UniProtKB/Swiss-Prot annotation:
Catalytic activity: tRNA(Leu) + L-leucine + ATP = L-leucyl-tRNA(Leu) + AMP + diphosphate
Record-listed ATP binding positions: 621
A biological-process GO annotation: leucyl-tRNA aminoacylation
Enzyme Commission number: 6.1.1.4
UniProt similarity note: Belongs to the class-I aminoacyl-tRNA synthetase family.
InterPro entries linked: aa-tRNA-synth_I_CS, aa-tRNA-synth_Ia, Leu-tRNA-ligase, Leu_tRNA-synth_edit, M/V/L/I-tRNA-synth_anticd-bd, Methionyl/Leucyl_tRNA_Synth, Rossmann-like_a/b/a_fold, tRNAsynth_Ia_anticodon-bd
Keywords: Aminoacyl-tRNA synthetase, ATP-binding, Cytoplasm, Ligase, Nucleotide-binding, Protein biosynthesis
Full protein name: Leucine--tRNA ligase
Sequence motif: 'KMSKS' region, positions: 618-622
Amino acid sequence: MQEQYNPQDIEHKVQQHWDNNKTFVVSEDPNKEKFYCLSMFPYPSGRLHMGHVRNYTIGDVVSRFQRLQGKNVLQPIGWDAFGLPAENAAVKNNTAPAPWTYENIEYMKNQLKLLGFGYDWNREFATCRPEYYRWEQEFFTKLFAKGLVYKKTSSVNWCPNDQTVLANEQVEDGCCWRCDTPVEQKEIPQWFIKITAYAQELLDDLDNLDGWPEMVKTMQRNWIGRSEGVELKFAVKGENTDLEVYTTRPDTLMGVTYVGIAAGHPLATKAAANNPALAAFIDECKNTKVAEAEIATMEKKGMATGLTAIHPLNGREVPIYIANFVLMDYGTGAVMAVPAHDQRDFEFATKYGLDIIPVIKPADGSELDVSEAAYTEKGVLFASGEFDGLDFQAAFNAIAAKLEAEGKGKKTVNFRLRDWGVSRQRYWGAPIPMVTTEDGQVHPVPADQLPVILPEDVVMDGVTSPIKADKEWAKTTFNGEPALRETDTFDTFMESSWYYARYCSPQADDILDPEKANYWLPVDQYIGGIEHACMHLLYSRFFYKLLRDAGYVKSDEPFKKLLCQGMVLADAFYYTNDKGGKEWVSPTEVKVERDGKGRIVSAVDATGRQVEHSGMIKMSKSKNNGIDPQEMVDKYGADTVRLFMMFASPADMTLEWQESGVEGANRFLRRVWKLVREHTELGQAPALDASALNADQKALRRDVHKTIAKVTDDVARRQTFNTAIAAIMELMNKLTKAPMTEAQDRAILDEALKAITLMLYPITPHICFEMWVALGQSNIDTASWPTYDEAALVEDEKLIVLQVNGKLRGKLTVAADATQQQVEALGMQDENVQKFIDGLTVRKVIYVPGKLLNIVAN
């Protein structure tokens, strides 16, 4: 062993060894238990950031731990390579998205290797390659054949100046990010996959995901949004048509005072035909893109259509309003409004002077007051004719039954979940494999003509997709007839919805090789950010069920266990520029002064300018507070960076980046290195003889085995890696202080250092690889996780606390198997105890076995 720990030398050498020996390349082995560990694959943005490093370090720790458990471990990596940032970067750098993407992949691949992650690089792929997306295209055509894919018009953000569609993130304050033109909503035909056909199963199967955080499951339940309600019809006076509405509160039906319809509703269009004011209001509504989450807080606006609806049960006539809070995409695009019992309806009715008729009162008999706000609780019906006195459930059933009997409604289950719109009017994505013939018929591209290849040698003008601009690209034939290709590309969530399955057989001449897929799948441990809870994780679950129903996989769910790592935070600093804006300064260029409690009291940048401390916030480009992992690896070594990442906070909590903590992690590794070197320089350690140990030696060995037991549980079951590391550090402190004079002292240290090296290996593999060899062992990559010796955990002696009248008066060491009588006798003989009971009568003795003896005397 070198005298000084030199991470750069060691890490380069060990990484070469892994590469040359293909250490992490695996194949199916039916005789071995498999473990599939996966971190969400990266978007090749150019450089790794600390969030990546945290995610991939956790994955590598789990993978290496499972390898030491003797399992056949698959840990693959690839690139989520399509997407908008590549288009933006290409325009900015005057290149095309493809070369920019491939360059980034090469650079980031090298960064991942320098961090020592144990990936099976043979399985690597980039989703922008035709050999990947070809299978996605073919699977889409199969879904089309099954009736699970359809086309319908749907609204998009449209820039009238650039004549192009904008992604939501390209709309800034309602205007185009490029030319500042106000953005309009435009209806265009788009492709959808029927995720709603699987809504109930996606909801039910969440109950089987015991290894998922409760929070993620709750988010998905809310996103799917199952509700039970009644679908009912209001006739429209003087029109030969009905308005369909869905309600979860049919008990409030007798309190309806108006009906609200969406601006995009056919009835709204009809009413606006001869009404310019109404037509203008509809345009205003249509061009305000409203996310469902914003409805509660936005200003409620409406306009009367002049049409009247007829109440289905009591025949009362109520006005029909166009309301900006009714969305065409949700339900039927029409709602029955009960201002007395719905706050949104209440605000609208108050604003437009509409009736507010209460029909529900509190069940406890307290007074009902709807003068200031709606009463939204469930209660008892009144002013509802034959339904008076019924509670919510009874009224729900009775009103639903009456509507059904009269052919005006029925009980129904509704989902908030909408079908998955997969069309994107962008260039850098997989082409959608559909063509339209001259007769207007749409056809899937036949399998033998796939893939539909995205041309990579293109010129980006920053406005129109090159495959839309090039009219020749779309020209093709179908069965000998002229046809036009679809020029939209797939939503990039398509690629990430099945990539985990492709890793099982990346060379397969089909979307999957079922035999290989069923050996590896489902993924045993998935690791990624909680921001993907509702989109990526839901789409992946859906796609997996599609693969199952197509006969490719046998299980129902793709990910058994899910760990959502916390964000990485860092100090952020800024100064105010001449225009009053904030200029963010990198923390690496700031010198700070701290008070006694470690709080920053002053900060100065490299030019000597005073800067403001904005706090510890998420590392991001916009706040210029990212720390480049590369610099940290160059300075301290990959093992130190990995150790800090795992130790600084629990894996699922935010992590505060502190370079002082990184230095601390580095010091700890140097201490371990030093102890191993000093130990091995003395030559081979004598054999351990457990029967020959004295009390101190037994106690130290007990600490070693207690640590093994704790670390095993922390890593395998609790996934609290930080407490596992803390336990190893505590053991190290004891070992450095322990005497090393006798043969058995060295034997215990030898056992302890081997255990520590194995336990640290998943976290800091390079240094442990070297120390393992120094400790006289062969290859740590194929070693086994240490097991604790039950016998070593058994204590020969117990420390008993002695109390008189509940106050501490002494301590007593007794044999572990001492009886209560023996402990009482020894306790009574204690000098200090005798002093405090002298002249008193002992009333009773309380004994807590193995812990405490309390003598009550007066």
